[in-house]
Amino acid sequence: MYIYAGSITESTGSLKGSGKGITVFSFDGEHLQKLQEVEDVQPSILKVYGDRLYCTNEVKDFTGLNGSGGGVSAYAVNKTDGTIQKISQSISYGSRPSYVVKSDDGKHLFVTNHGSHTTVTCHYIKNNLGQFVLERQFDDSSVAMFAVQKDGSIGNLQDLQVIHGSGYWCHGGGQSTSHLHCVKTKGEYIYTCNRGKDTIEVFTYKNNRLQLIQECQCPYGYAPRHMEILGEYTFVLYENYPAVSLFQLKQGKLYALDISITMPKTYYDVYPLPHFDKPHADKEEINTCGMADKRRAMPSDIHVFKEYVYVSNRCFSSFGTVSLLKMEKEKLAYTASYALPGKDPRGFAVSKDGNYLFVALCDTGKIYVYALDPLTKEIVKEVDHIYCPGVSSLAVV
């Protein structure tokens, strides 16, 4: 079994750039062993498809020109020993690319460009009163579609869709503008979680063009961050408040079925889930989301194994957790949460056989392996851990 770990190599926000690139590990059921470390620029998210690995380069100046955008890279995977070698790279045609995924037919690569929370272009313009006032222009947030060459390398850009708008906490808290965070595919449909706008955009792609067919409204202020698709169901994890929604897919479009907690019930006695009945907060409204109040939990990633749903929660004032939910009759049932030896769990994954859970703790720079109960899929014990500075995402094959 091989584990591929992306990392944060350049400090940004609360994240320290202690990583060097992509690290390859092996796991024999008992021990993790480091096999290879390949230097790359901010390969924060990675995905493995057979003998090819793709990663985002989550920066604003991938070409060396400040503000020119991030990048996306492709690697060949040696199936014999698990090692990797870069075969191509491209600009991502946007700032801070946050996710990469390959189409089901293997012919296209989709990349979401998140955009920066803080870096803006400032212009002073004259208003109707003849006064010069500051106008702040944020980075575009977009989804880019690339061709995939026969050898798996990244081909030409085929389409780029820029999404505008803002979310409930539009006066701060990371929702002043659109921020596409995650992209997933199912057949001819493309789904993007827009944590800056509280929406999920649904596209089809035909003749190398993307077409928007639905803008699914999520709970105002909740900031959809990650999603997983399992058959006819989609699980959407929110970043601003610890909750996960279950949607049903019908002809590619999303229809809400249920919403569930991702933390112990005692947490919500102190921090109940809010309900906002308008798309934008008042300017003087106190921001209660996790981006503004660090005492609150901030969900980070989601992984689905059969009917079991795993969620990681960042808790900067105490300790991070992994929570287990179960889907039953189109409902989500919270089962348990497990404390982690760190505050900032990022990527994680369940092994294909469902026996192990791998968790990346970004703040401590360690990867942990936990054994799962074969029947309940609850965490049984820690099996091993290993040092991996700045680790931010995992792929287990």
Locate the predicted segments by residue.
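Short coil/turn segments that connect the beta-strands within blades of beta-propeller domains
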Residues: 1, 50-51, 105-107, 187-188, ...
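Conserved beta-strand positions in repeat-built beta-propeller and related beta-rich domains
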Residues: 5-8, 15-16, 55-59, 65-66, ...
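Short loop/turn segments immediately following beta-strands, especially the blade-tip
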Residues: 25-30, 75-82, 145-155, 203-209, ...
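Asp-box/WD-like beta-propeller blade repeats and closely related beta-sheet repeat scaffolds
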Residues: 83-181
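Surface-exposed loop and turn segments in beta-propeller and other repeat-based domains
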Residues: 89-91, 157-175, 257-294, 386-397
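Loop/turn-rich, solvent-exposed surfaces of beta-rich toroidal or solenoidal domains
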Residues: 294-329, 337-359
